[in-house]
Each structure stands twice: as C-alpha cells, then as structure tokens.
Amino acid sequence: GQGSLAYPGLRTQGNLETLSGPNDATRGLTSLADTFEHVIEELLDEQQVIQPSKENKDADLYSTRVMLSSQVPLEPPLLFLLEEYKNYLDAANMSMRVRRHSDPARRGELSVCDSTSEWVTAAEKKTAVDMSGATVTVLEKVPVPKGQLKQYFYETKCSSKGYAKEGCRGIDKRYWNSQCRTTQSFVRALTMDNKKRVG
C-alpha cells in the first residue's frame, strides 16, 4: 500500500495486515526488512542535515555514548548503533541492493583490533579534562525530582586478549610494527569544576 507518515521524515512502506497468502507473507517480511533499512537511512540522512558547521562548533559535542538512568542500560545506545551502521555503509561504499547482502559476518571479516564495549559510571573515572584543558569532576549521580539517576558512559577499549599485544591484523609484521591502543575522546557529560559549577 501507500506509505503513511509514522514519524516526521520517516515513511513506512508496508505492514503485515495487508497480506493474504503465504507468498505474500514472504514478500511482506522482505518489505518490512526493506522498510527497516529505509528508516535507518532516513534517520542517518536527518543527522547529516544537522551536522555542525564551522560557526556551530558546539554541536560537535553531541554524544551518543552518555546516558542518565536508574540502572545499567541493557543495550548499546541506539544512536551509537546507527552511527556504527552508517560508518560501515560509508566504508563499503556500495549500492542499496548490494548492502542488503553484505553483512560483514557473512564474509568472515574481522576487525583490525579486537575491542570490548560496556557501560561504566564515574565510579571508575572520577575526573576528566574538559575542552579548555581544565580538570573537572565527573558527576556519578544526578539529582532529579524523584531521586537520583546515574550517569553512564558507553566505553569502548582494546580487548586484553587477542591481537592487542601482537599487533594489528592485516599488517605485515616482517616490515611494519603496529599496536592497538585505546584513545580518548570528548563527550558531552555532566561535570563540576573547581568552583562547584555544574555543567
């Protein structure tokens, strides 16, 4: 059927209620898979529209890796997953039709360096350096009208197993030295400076 507006800027292309037979069901599931991919691509296109310009550097600080919650989040952040998917598509640089059949797991692809990701709190790292170079205290708990929420960070770091000590995959060790290292990045988070200002 004709698409309907589910969210601003997102169009659905089919539903299971319009199906009548077993062959239609198979086509419907394929249609739903296509719709899901289409929705993800539209979300990513929307994100590109609001990409920061040189005049709006504050938008660079938007983070997909920080969450306020009363308990440890069970899943990676949705925007982080969308970002990973977008990076994969950009790197592959393929047409839509080829993308559907290009899951890296199917082709046996491996990352250059093994990594692990998990949610952590400020209990593990109480201080940080802000973009102006000042040391700030990272708030572990944030007061809200009905109690407190913890500030969680989705941290990705090199795996202690695997190739971290032996070098990176795909590098010819006869001619090149390589090393997998965890790097630091800026994220938008709630902190307190030495004058007790929270921001």
UniProtKB/Swiss-Prot annotation:
Disulfide bond residue pairs: 113-180
Subcellular location: Secreted
Glycan-linked positions: 93
Region described as Disordered: spans on this chain: 1-23
GO molecular function: growth factor activity; nerve growth factor receptor binding
Compositional bias segments (type: Polar residues): 12-23
Keywords associated with the record: Cleavage on pair of basic residues, Disulfide bond, Glycoprotein, Growth factor, Secreted
Listed GO CC annotations: axon; dendrite; extracellular space; synaptic vesicle
SUPFAM superfamilies recorded: Cystine-knot cytokines
Propeptide, residue positions: 1-100
Gene Ontology BP annotations: cell surface receptor protein tyrosine kinase signaling pathway; modulation of chemical synaptic transmission; negative regulation of neuron apoptotic process; nerve development; nerve growth factor signaling pathway; neuron projection morphogenesis
Task performed by this protein: Promotes the survival of neuronal populations that are all located either in the central nervous system or directly connected to it.
Homology family: Belongs to the NGF-beta family.
Protein's recorded name: Neurotrophic factor BDNF precursor form
Species whose genome carries this gene: Eunectes notaeus (Yellow anaconda)
Gene behind the chain: BDNF
